[in-house]
């Protein structure tokens, strides 16, 4: 059986502060054919002083749109997506612009709160309860989307080993479910 493809989009820090990404890769690489994107590179962002404010501004002032365009150019095969923070917003917007996705698991994509349309795929959103910028319940009801709110965590919950394990378990259970269905059908 061939592996399903999983595209992973980093948060705004990319690989610079992304040692936690290796934990996701460790869990998932034997079950998925993985493509990883550092969203700073996708967005052509090269700010001299990489403070959170400067990086955030660079993404908001055109970087997100650039990354969306580059992602659409690079990805043509329908795949599953796992995306973090701004990477989740990029994946969301790319899907709305026609990038075909089998599923989207987005953790802390707070800027999606400004979106009026939802992706055309199975979507799982996860936010920390203490993330001041997460969308509210009214937004998720309006878009008919379920949000998982994790108690006692903030925006960067995706870097925590417990959350990493939980997210990977969700993605792996989906693989096992698909394999089970394929065996039954075959």
Positions of the model-derived regions?
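Gly/Ala-rich beta-loop-alpha elbow adjacent to hydrolase catalytic centers
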Residues: 82-91
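A conserved short beta-strand
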Residues: 99-111
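Serine-hydrolase catalytic machinery in alpha/beta-hydrolase-like enzymes
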Residues: 3-74
